[in-house]
Amino acid sequence: MGNSSGWRGPAGQRRMLFLFLLSLLDQALSEPIRYAIPEELDRGSLVGNLAKDLGFGVGDLPTRNLRVIAEKKFFTVSPENGNLLVSDRIDREEICGKKSTCVLEFEMVAEKPLNFFHVTVLIQDINDNPPTFSQNITELEISELALTGATFALESAQDPDVGVNSLQQYYLSPDPHFSLIQKENLDGSRYPELVLKAPLDREEQPHHHLVLTAVDGGEPSRSCTTQIRVIVADANDNPPVFTQDMYRVNVAENLPAGSSVLKVMAIDMDEGINAEIIYAFINIGKEVRQLFKLDSKTGELTTIGELDFEERDSYTIGVEAKDGGHHTAYCKVQIDISDENDNAPEITLASESQHIQEDAELGTAVALIKTHDLDSGFNGEILCQLKGNFPFKIVQDTKNTYRLVTDGALDREQIPEYNVTITATDKGNPPLSSSKTITLHILDVNDNVPVFHQASYTVHVAENNPPGASIAHVRASDPDLGPNGLVSYYIVASDLEPRELSSYVSVSARSGVVFAQRAFDHEQLRAFELTLQARDQGSPTLSANVSLRVLVDDRNDNAPLVLYPALGPEGSALFDMVPRSAEPGYLVTKVVAVDADSGYNAWLSYHIVQASEPGLFSLGLRTGEVRTARTLGDREAARQRLLVTVRDGGQQPLSATVMLHLIFADSLQEIQPDLSDRPTPSDPQAELQFHLVVALALISVLFLLAVILAISLRLRCSSRPATEGYFQPGVCFKTVPGVLPTYSERTLPYSYNPCAASHSSNTEFKFLNIKAENAAPQDLLCDEASWFESNDNPEMPSNSGNLQKQAPPNTDWRFSQAQRPGTSGSQNGDDTGTWPNNQFDTEMLQAMILASASEAADGSSTLGGGAGTMGLSARYGPQFTLQHVPDYRQNVYIPGSNATLTNAAGKRDGKAPAGGNGNKKKSGKKEKK
């Protein structure tokens, strides 16, 4: 009930109307489109509007691409309006011969979607051919004894036209002895016969001349004539007679040449020459004469050519029997040709394009196939199929039309093309078949992502590389074709931020070669990572990423930098004091140097280049420790010089040199004559300052002697007070390394603020102020409260009475066992250090040096560090916590003393360590002074 009510409404009526129209359209498309035209139309003549008859609009023509599929194209389709036009000469007689109906059949193909349309064109005959006789003159011999009413066969005229345009009538010129009758063959063609109206008399008229005219039925009619010459022969009263008026025979089309078809026979009751019969063809065309032969004596009909059912299926032949007396008889021979399976099927591809995209859906039409077999019946029925295993199949549309469609997934990267063999087989016995191979090209689509040849890339680049040099080459492959497989390379990310990426590296979009845009510095940038992207040119674009890690390898491009000893202001030399009683192995001083490079390029060695007294001192190869090799002789000079070279371990080693000035003396007073040997111009102000400084120095020496005596009694070990400086113009005692708040271009820059005497013309002391930016670090030997300010400082009066007192040195400085230079604190002769195991340890060490130097610049580094810091203040560089590196942690010593440092609890503020009460009391007295 619900369904019937749904069809009754407006929607149901529209649905029924749509189904009705759809059925009509389907019926119309399934039936062939028929046209009728006369033959011999001019080229370009209109046959019909095919597009309109197919239901196509003018706008659909460019996309549907209508075209004719036929073995011989007599027609074409106009792409502008869809008209079916004549493209070649159409001669009905040449195409169809004597067939009553001449039809040209062909297929029309339309694309998008792909469809077949069957078209038939009926070719109408026009009267374009006149009747013709094979001979202009025909001789006919008739016995004078011929009876009235006797008939004589005449040559028929041939007219290729059919229907009303064919031969319709024969006319004979008027004659009292003869008349003309017309008869029809089984096929409807007419032939004339001459009838004797009156007896002939050879003696009265031996010859008769007649004119035979053949006229067709066209409008206007066409005609032709032939001359008939009748010869009156002598009497022969018995004509031959055939055993049959019509002979019929059926032969196979594959009958070989020379085979007998049949035998005709005529009987003549006469005797002698009048009974001798001669057989001959009569009223036949040229085609029959090329296929058959008649024996004139026996009447046997044989083949001389190959019969073909597909060209013609039957022949009607006239045979004449003539005796010696010129009597004749006539019969007809009907030869029917039976079909044999002698024609293999023919395959025609109706589609021009043989390309298909690899992402085509199942059932997509690839090619249109048309088959044809000239045989008939079962011999002409065709089965079409594929040969081989392919992702395609054949779908039949009509009797002889098929579609090749996809039946599986296509992948151009695996199989770029298919050679498909199509086989058509008929149903004859035995069956015949034919094959045709077509090549189907698979069109590429962008379905493959570029793939890098490596999962990740790591390259090493030596620093100081030339800008623009290639540092890496990444490669990616894309199996697609054309733009889909054309790969371009881009840098999409890096860890160089906030640095500008374009100023460091670039990549060639075509080749994937990565170029350095600048020279890299291992000391500033040791490694960075890039993310490169390979992108194809397809639509949509597909891409893949890969990481490229660039490791900047170190080169030996930084020479060692000597931290200690350093030159004073204006290049003045520094001196170290050595006790005259120093035993062999006594630690005199230590050369401290650093190298901004890494690895073996920063592995330093120390060498004595020149010595004022060779053999007096030894130098640790790796530690830089200067020790006495023997005791000082009595005649040897107290003032010694050593020229020390520091070399790194690079392939082409770099070096730095430093001059050490050493004085053998047991007290400060002993060195004063050496310091004042140089004559200087007299300056009253300088002399005053000199006396003040000397007085202060004497007081300090007395105080230090008292402190040293107390400590020696307590600790039962001898020690010598450290001297603060040498009082001589142009000479400075100890330099104070301090770390700048901001680093220079090198990795570990140091600034040294010496506590030195200025170069003046008088033998006086001027103590310079510490620079403001370097004031935060504290000196190991004297703090800021112990410095004497020069008269150049406006905040300090020039009188010597207001000079501040210097705090005594801390005599309880010793290295612990863990703090001693080298691998153990007790060794002296170890000139080789243990280098870090790998570059990472070295880089970690340098990072710690930088961090410690930064703390020193902030004033946070103190003298008494924990275990492993070696007791260094910020002025002597960063606090070292690694015990296995001999470069920096061993290069610390107490100038002028062989005592080792320990962690002091108190600062150098004039107070002794908490462990010694006597020292504390003496320090308090000095403060009161």
Swiss-Prot record:
Extracellular compartment residues: 31-691
First and last residue of the signal peptide: 1-30
InterPro entries: Cadherin-like_dom, Cadherin-like_sf, Cadherin_C, Cadherin_CBD, Cadherin_CS, Cadherin_N, Protocadherin/Cadherin-CA
Main subcellular localisation: membrane
Subcellular location: Cell membrane
Membrane topology: Single-pass type I membrane protein
Start-end of Basic residues biased regions: 919-929
Cited PANTHER family: CADHERIN-87A (PTHR24028), PROTOCADHERIN GAMMA-B3-RELATED (PTHR24028:SF73)
Protein name: Protocadherin gamma-B3
Biological classification of the source: Eukaryota, Metazoa, Chordata, Craniata, Vertebrata
Gene name as annotated: PCDHGB3
